[in-house]
Amino acid sequence: MLSTRVVRLPKVISGGNKQLARGLASLSDEKSLNEANPTDLAGLKRKAKRRPTKLADELKTGPSFADFVTGKAKDMLVDPLELARNDPNARLPSWLKTQIPKGKSFHHLKSDLKELKLSTVCEEAKCPNIGECWGGKKSEATATIMLMGDTCTRGCRFCSVKTNRNPAPPDPNEPENTAEAISRWGLGYVVLTTVDRDDLPDGGAHHLASTVTKIKEKAPQILVECLSGDFRGNLEMAKVLASSPLDVFAHNLETVEDLTPHIRDRRATYRQSLSVLRAAKEANPRLVTKTSLMLGFGETDDQILQTLHDLRNISCDVVTFGQYMRPTKRHMKVVEYVTPSKFEYWRDKALEMGFLYCASGPLVRSSYKAGEAFIENVIKKRRTNVGAIEEQQHDKENNNLLLSKEDEKTTQEKANF
């Protein structure tokens, strides 16, 4: 049994003497503890000591000077960055590498966007194709304008766009500025997208529709694709946008149904997204409807196939597949880097199921320009009221031509791999 020695203190202890009293009592307890069990006191003293720094630990357990002299140190290094440099499996696959953005067209687009205070999903979402899309010839260069600011009210686990519950209100001059910028570039096809604005009563539907109208007023020849949110499931707002003069209505499923709750914001559901695409088609049957899926989250083939069936059941015309790329360490990890041959498989499968067009590849994104030339031809023919049978035949011929070009690109990617 431990004995306790009582330290007699004055009855009246004032101010700073209280701390002295507590210290004396502590020393008394320590002394009695030492007399009873010296090993316990040693343990307490070890805990009280300052813990060694990480650097000190690494110096003690890491390579010694002799290890560096003999060359053994290189086998003892555990630095993750060093391991990644030396391990090919820890690095990005060769087919996911892109060139540094450059060129006159690239800098011209960037300058105009800054001058007119416009945001693009190309920059905000760190798209790997920015150099290709912005750096093309004037008639080919494309920028996906992100409307209603650069801050989203949702926080999906794959997206690097800034989030805030109460972002700044939309710029009332944005529709006019956007139309002005696009008319300057002399584009034939433009993509408009938007952050989710759950803070707005209409989800921003009227702002988007106004922007499309302004663009058509300034440059009626330009084809407009609008990649919208789900308007919190308000299908009337989806119909407002679909009834504007746009040509392609796009809304992304992002992933398969089973993974949606783990990847997208809780306010975005798989069935809700399907309803938005269906409502747009019903409001304007002549619209081309489009969606996009990212692969690499751990989805199965059966899940992807079921998603394609769900899209065909609502008459979705276009689907794209791309590789999920982790924007930062705070976002969801990549489960798998899908090979180019697997992307080719899903493209063929989608076309077999009756999709009008499918762009599928590691670097393909929902607004990637690869399919725009084909979609342009489809829209123009629909505008001129070409017969359905003749239209389908032309579409098939154009699609086969485009597929042959993509096959050449895939073959090159495989060769690089």
Swiss-Prot record:
Its cofactor is [4Fe-4S] cluster. It catalyses: [[Fe-S] cluster scaffold protein carrying a second [4Fe-4S](2+) cluster] + N(6)-octanoyl-L-lysyl-[protein] + 2 oxidized [2Fe-2S]-[ferredoxin] + 2 S-adenosyl-L-methionine + 4 H(+) = [[Fe-S] cluster scaffold protein] + N(6)-[(R)-dihydrolipoyl]-L-lysyl-[protein] + 4 Fe(3+) + 2 hydrogen sulfide + 2 5'-deoxyadenosine + 2 L-methionine + 2 reduced [2Fe-2S]-[ferredoxin]. Pathway: Protein modification; protein lipoylation via endogenous pathway; protein N(6)-(lipoyl)lysine from octanoyl-[acyl-carrier-protein]: step 2/2. InterPro entries: Aldolase_TIM, Elp3/MiaA/NifB-like_rSAM, LIAS_N, Lipoyl_synth, rSAM. The keyword Iron-sulfur applies. [4Fe-4S] cluster 2 binds at C152, C156, C159. Its EC number is 2.8.1.8. The keyword Transferase applies. SMART domains: Elp3. Pfam families: LIAS_N, Radical_SAM. It comes from the Eukaryota. Residues 35-56, 389-417 are annotated as: Disordered. GO terms for molecular function: 4 iron, 4 sulfur cluster binding; lipoate synthase activity; metal ion binding. Keywords: 4Fe-4S, Iron, Iron-sulfur, Metal-binding, Mitochondrion, S-adenosyl-L-methionine, Transferase. Residues 137-356 form the Radical SAM core domain. CDD domains: Radical_SAM. This protein may be expected to contain an N-terminal transit peptide but none has been predicted. HAMAP family: Lipoyl_synth. This is Lipoyl synthase, mitochondrial. It comes from Komagataella phaffii (strain GS115 / ATCC 20864). The lineage of its organism: Eukaryota, Fungi, Dikarya, Ascomycota, Saccharomycotina.
